[in-house]
């Protein structure tokens, strides 16, 4: 069972792209994507503080994580994490379905 549970919100197509991602980051949100398996990729938004708290544990990178998107739960593993070069805060995360 997953030790980490993150709450996410699905992003509409008009909330995707460079400008929209910058606006999300200013609101302390992190854009992310969930892909893999037989399902279509899903663009989501995570809370920065919630993601940073999970990243404090090295186990987060090795175990399956549950992401709740609305009423659906996705079991995923982190595939890639992009950080700000100076601040070291997460800028974008890629999750692959487990």
From Swiss-Prot:
GO terms for cellular component? cytosolic large ribosomal subunit
Instruction: From the UniProt record, give one GO term of the biological process aspect.
Output: translation
Enumerate the InterPro entries for this protein: Rbsml_bL25/Gln-tRNA_synth_N, Ribosomal_bL25/Gln-tRNA_synth, Ribosomal_bL25_short, Ribosomal_L25_dom, Ribosomal_uL5_bac-type
The answer to keyword tRNA-binding applying to this record is no
Q: Which domain of life is it from?
A: Bacteria
- Where in this protein does the record put region Disordered? 1-23
Short name of one Pfam family: Ribosomal_L25p
A single MF term (Gene Ontology): 5S rRNA binding
Q: List the Gene3D superfamilies hit by this protein, alphabetically.
A: Ribosomal Protein L25, Chain P
What are the protein's UniProt keywords? Answer: Ribonucleoprotein, Ribosomal protein, RNA-binding, rRNA-binding
Family per similarity comment:
Belongs to the bacterial ribosomal protein bL25 family.
Q: What do we know about how this protein assembles, alone or with others?
A: Part of the 50S ribosomal subunit; part of the 5S rRNA/L5/L18/L25 subcomplex. Contacts the 5S rRNA. Binds to the 5S rRNA independently of L5 and L18.
Function, as annotated: This is one of the proteins that binds to the 5S RNA in the ribosome where it forms part of the central protuberance.
PANTHER family in alphabetical order: RIBOSOMAL PROTEIN L25/GLN-TRNA SYNTHETASE, ANTI-CODON-BINDING DOMAIN-CONTAINING PROTEIN, RIBOSOMAL PROTEIN L25_GLN-TRNA SYNTHETASE, ANTI-CODON-BINDING DOMAIN-CONTAINING PROTEIN
Identify this protein by name: Large ribosomal subunit protein bL25
The organism of origin for this protein = Acinetobacter baumannii (strain AB0057)
Give me the gene this protein comes from: rplY
């Amino acid at each position: 069972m997953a030790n980490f549970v993150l709450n996410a919100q699905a992003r509409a197509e008009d909330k995707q792209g460079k400008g929209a991602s910058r606006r999300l980051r200013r609101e302390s949100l992190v854009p992310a994507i969930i892909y893999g398996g037989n399902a279509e990729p899903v663009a989501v938004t995570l809370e920065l503080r919630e993601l940073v708290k999970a990243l404090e544990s090295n186990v987060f990178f090795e175990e399956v994580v549950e992401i709740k998107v609305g009423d659906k739960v996705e079991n995923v593993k982190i595939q890639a994490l992009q950080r700000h070069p100076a601040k070291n805060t997460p800028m974008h995360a890629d999750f692959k379905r487990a």
